[in-house]
Regions:
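Asp-based, Mg2+/Mn2+-dependent phosphohydrolase catalytic module
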Residues: 1-9, 116-117, 130-132, 139-240
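Hydrophobic alpha-helical core bundles mediating ligand binding, dimerization, or RNAP-core interactions
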Residues: 26-34, 48-55, 72, 90-98, ...
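A metal-dependent, Asp-based hydrolase signature
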Residues: 52-95
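Residues at alpha-helix caps and immediate loop-helix transition turns in enzyme cores, especially N-
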Residues: 22-25, 107, 137-138, 167-170
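Active-site neighborhood of HAD-like aspartate-dependent phosphohydrolases
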Residues: 2-50
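Short histidine/acidic/glycine/proline-rich micro-motifs that form metal-
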Residues: 17-19, 57-58, 129-133, 160-161
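Substrate-recognition element of Asp-dependent hydrolases with the DxDx(T/V) motif
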Residues: 92-94, 102-104, 111-143
Length: 240
């Protein structure tokens, strides 16, 4: 929509607002949750493969169910363990061992200041993280970043999402819930494919070059820069 003011920022979390060693994070996550979430008779390697397939089921979700439902439906079929049996085990993992994964992350002050300035200027903020996790896991990662859940008007979790990035449905679901148009929004993220796919809908993209995933040369039409450049950009934005 020509002339519409962009007053909303969608932010990715992992690798964007929360800098992290993605390989170390995923390894610790899959090993930890597999030990907690499958029965002892299943070998750890087989269990990790089951959890990975359940995650892929969420990534490929067609919108017919929530990501949470896609995850547990797949895991139940592969492991023979019901959701009712799995949930307490996974809750224990997120309440305990998951917290140690914080060691794979750190606080980026420029990212914290970026969010703070946007809030002060009146912009609406959405945490558009890949919705593969329950609320407790996502909320903990927000805290690890130096931010808090109240910084955001909306946060995507696996139980309130029916798609994953880069599906257009992921973005349109949030837009519809918040009565927004894509032309009102920026998308900030470090993934050249998943995050910048929002531009096809009308978002303005900012590809964060720190912790970049994908090939920067294949993305055109968006702003590109590191944390300090992003901070300078928002400092120069008008108040809403």
């Amino acid at each position: 929509m020509v002339g519409q003011i962009r007053d909303t920022f969608f932010f990715d979390l992992d690798g964007t607002l929360l800098p992290l060693d993605m390989d170390a994070f995923l390894e610790a996550y899959y090993i930890g949750i597999t030990k907690r979430g499958v029965c002892e008779s299943i070998h750890i390697t087989d269990g990790m493969e089951m959890f990975q397939k359940a995650v892929y089921a969420m990534i490929g979700n067609d919108g017919s169910m929530t990501n949470q439902q896609a995850f547990f439906e797949t895991l139940e079929a592969l492991s023979g363990t019901t959701m009712e049996q799995l949930m307490p085990l996974m809750d224990d993992f997120y309440a305990g061992e998951f917290k140690t994964i914080k060691n794979c992350t750190y606080v980026e002050e420029d990212a914290v200041q970026t969010v703070k300035i946007l809030k002060e200027k009146g912009y609406r903020l959405v945490l558009a993280t890949q919705p593969l996790f329950p609320q407790t896991a996502t909320n903990q990662r927000i805290e690890w970043s130096g931010l808090c859940i109240d910084d955001f008007e909306y946060i995507s979790y696996y139980d309130n999402s029916h798609y994953c990035k880069p599906s257009p449905g992921y973005f349109t679901e949030i837009l519809d819930k918040l009565d927004l148009s894509a032309e009102q929004c920026y998308m900030v993220g470090n993934d050249a494919r998943d995050d910048m796919s929002a531009m096809a809908l009308g978002f303005e993209g900012y590809l964060l070059t720190n912790h970049l995933i994908g090939e920067i040369g294949k993305v055109t039409g968006c702003k590109k820069g590191d944390y300090s450049e992003l901070l300078n950009l928002v400092k120069n934005l008008p108040r809403i």
